[in-house]
Amino acid sequence: VTNKLMGERVFRKIMGTGYPDSANVKAGSKAIKYHLDYMHWLLDQRRWLAGNELSLADFAAAAHLSCLDYVSDVDWNRSVIVKDWYAKIKSRPAFRSILADQISGFPQPSHYSDLDF
């Protein structure tokens, strides 16, 4: 998901390798919906993605979502449960440096670094 969306929309522009491949963008957009739905299902069953304790799985998934959120590719209205989970991860001190990152030529959306978005 991240490679299809970020690779096409961001990396191609940075590397100067042409315009985004619309088939890859479409596939990535479809895949993120599936993953958000699956995360919703997991978080409906437990507190965190891999169980009832915060784990590396949460940080890994949140890091990918952070990249996609930076370019506004996450529909946070799709799942309040996933949005609340992500807000909890964003509020962790260990995650703050990720939220401070910026990509030249790609302004972050106003909600990106807002912990209570």
Place the predicted regions along the sequence by residue.
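GST-like fold's C-terminal all-alpha helical module
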Residues: 1-91
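Residue-level signal for well-ordered alpha-helical positions
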Residues: 71, 101-102
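Acidic/histidine-enriched, glycine/proline-rich intrinsically disordered or flexible terminal extensions
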Residues: 102-117
